[in-house]
Regions:
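Bacterial N-terminal signal peptides that target proteins for export
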Residues: 1-8
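Hydrophobic core
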Residues: 12, 16-17
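Acidic/aromatic-lined carbohydrate-recognition and catalytic surfaces
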Residues: 20-24, 29-228, 239, 250-298
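Active-site-proximal helices and loops of the catalytic beta/alpha 8
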Residues: 29-45, 135-136, 152-153, 158-178, ...
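Loop/helix patches that line or flank the sugar-binding groove of alpha-linked glycan CAZymes
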Residues: 40, 58, 336, 354-357, ...
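Structural recognition of the beta-strand scaffold that forms the well-ordered cores
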Residues: 62-64, 98-103, 146-147, 246, ...
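Beta-strand-rich binding/interaction modules
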Residues: 504-523
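C-terminal beta-strand-rich structural cap/linker in extracellular carbohydrate-active enzymes
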Residues: 530-549
Length: 549
């Protein structure tokens, strides 16, 4: 335990510095973040990183980026890869160790989930050379990158689909398509009957399946040649340095057929890891706890933990019920249940918790713009085991709800909306104001949501047991409105206590005399202290205990 003890000491020093040091209010260059604006002093952070650095593995702190809305480098109002590259110092300073890029390929839509070419970059975002420069800059900072891999469908302007459609238009009446004459006709689903989610090819009696949209024809993922194409695509981007892929809409590969979807995912996992042994894959399975558990039998490394994320997930539900003892105590039990079910299905699983993403409303709206509840939600998400995901702008309390474009608003760098701020996506409805202000307004405030994020991420990254530990409810402490969980990873352990309540609490730790306070997170600035076996926890406060030396 010597290594953990040194981390504890350094964390306590850093947290003390946070409590008594006013962060300078000079306006920083937002291409990065000036070193003197750190919540934990850079000296303390350097010592923590030197002694408590997490292993270089697939347990990461990811940041989801919609390039279109993140940072514009050339003044055309649309975010691009060079703009994102210019903000990597900002992300590194936040503590980010992984980036998930939403689709970056040529596309006819603003969101780019209708891919026209899997081997290129959309001209709005830049070039392959820009991508390579971005990857090199990420590598210099120890940031892994995963890209969105959209396999359920292509765009209807993809060469594969256009070639197949041209073939069908010239097919003699009454003749059946033959993949030996045009292999691409076997890449998609065509018939002459139509049906729900089927769309007619103009000038013909042929229909194609596109369950999401007529602009998104569905691929036949059982086709061996399609699988060969997928293999080639993964090889191409892995060769360019990506660490893995986010798999879009995996439960819609064969809608309603979990067994068929699991087979496809098993093949993708096996193929990806044959290309790159530690290739990281995370699937979007927007479904129930039971379904997500079944999908883990595929062997896929990760699935986004929808049962805990989103407006109706466990985290938001518990926070909205703050002060209700039974609901609060159910949180740690739910964490244990998920750990047991997911690990039974795949012993090598890595959970992928999140609060919100590009398809759902933002967490600020889930908790009625309450800053302390936003902080509590951040701690609950980031301190979960696995690779946690943070949606861009979440760290400054951005709002976003309603139609999809409104959930993908421009990153709010400053109130002047310059310094790389993009134009909104088409049909995006911006709020009149953001309740917590811009990054520029928060960066010098030591009590801001942004600086809270820096603090909780730094603790997560310094204590590997937090991301990698097996989670169980600590029943003796999981009472009243205190959520208590124990994490175990090898010989390391920690206990995380959260006061999910609007009132302060005293926690009796007399039975835990051999444990010490390693780190703490105060949402409202209230003191967190362990004295004579009693722990003081302010409203929405978090304490992390570790065994004493």
């Amino acid at each position: 335990m010597k290594r953990m003890t040194k981390i504890v000491s350094l964390l306590l020093v850093a947290l003390l510095l946070f409590g008594c040091t006013k962060i300078p209010t000079t306006t920083p260059d937002l291409s990065g973040v000036a070193s003197d604006t750190a919540v934990l002093t850079e000296a303390a952070l350097a010592e923590i990183k030197a002694l408590g650095e997490s292993p270089d593995d697939n347990y990461r702190t990811f940041y989801e980026v919609f390039v279109y809305s993140f940072c514009d480098s050339d003044g055309d109002g649309i975010g691009d890869l060079n703009g994102l590259t210019s903000k990597l110092d900002y992300l590194q300073n936040l503590g980010i160790t992984g980036i998930w890029l939403m689709p970056i390929h040529p596309s006819q839509s603003y969101h780019k989930y209708d891919v026209a070419d899997y081997y290129d970059i959309d001209p709005q975002y830049g070039t392959l050379e820009d991508f390579d420069a971005f990857m090199a800059a990420c590598s210099e900072r120890g940031i892994n990158v995963i890209t969105d891999l959209v396999l359920n469908h292509t765009g209807n302007d993809h060469e594969w689909f256009l070639t197949a459609v041209d073939y069908l238009k010239n097919l003699p009446e009454g003749a059946e398509p033959n993949a030996e004459d045009c292999k691409y006709v076997g890449y998609y689903y065509f018939n002459q009957e139509g049906g729900s989610g089927w769309h007619q090819i103009p000038g013909t009696n042929w229909y194609y399946e596109g369950q999401f949209s007529p602009h998104m024809p569905d691929l036949d993922l059982a086709n061996a040649q399609v699988r060969a194409e997928i293999t080639s695509i993964m090889e191409f981007w892995i060769d360019r340095g990506v660490s893995g892929f986010r798999l879009d809409a995996v439960k819609e590969f064969y809608s309603g057929n979990i067994a068929a979807n699991v087979e496809v995912l098993s093949w993708i996992q096996e193929t990806a890891t044959s290309i790159k042994e530690d290739c990281y894959l995370v699937g979007e399975c927007w479904d129930s706890f039971g379904a997500v558990s079944q999908y883990y039998t595929s062997g896929l490394t990760s699935f986004f933990d929808f049962p805990f994320g989103n407006s109706n997930g466990k985290i938001a539900s518990v926070i909205r019920a703050a002060g209700t003892a039974n609901t609060v105590s159910s949180y740690a039990k739910a964490l244990q249940q998920a750990n047991e079910a997911y690990s039974a299905a795949n012993p090598d699983y890595i959970d992928a918790p999140f609060l919100s993403n590009h398809d759902v409303g933002r967490i600020a709206g889930f908790v009625n713009r309450d800053e302390n509840k936003m902080k509590m939600a951040a701690a609950m998400n980031i301190l979960m085991s696995g690779s946690c995901f943070i949606y861009y702008g979440e760290e400054i309390g951005m709002l976003g709800s309603g139609n999809d474009p409104s959930k993908r608003a421009p990153m709010y760098w400053n109130a002047a909306r310059d310094n790389g701020t993009t134009n909104p996506p088409p049909e995006c409805e911006l709020p009149d104001e953001y309740p917590l202000g811009s990054l520029e307004e928060q960066i010098g405030d030591d009590s801001s949501l942004y600086n809270y994020y820096r603090q909780v991420i730094a603790i997560r990254n310094a204590m590997p047991v937090i991301a990698r530990g097996n989670t169980t409810a600590e029943e003796a402490l999981n009472i009243n409105c205190i959520s208590a969980q124990r994490k175990t990873w090898g010989e390391e352990e920690c206990i995380i206590l959260m006061n999910i309540n609007t009132e302060a609490a005293q926690v009796d730790l007399s039975a835990y005399a051999d444990w010490t306070l390693a780190a703490s997170l105060s949402a409202d600035g209230g003191e967190i202290a362990l004295d004579a076996g009693s722990l003081s926890l302010p409203a929405f406060g978090t304490a992390i205990l570790v065994p004493a030396a």
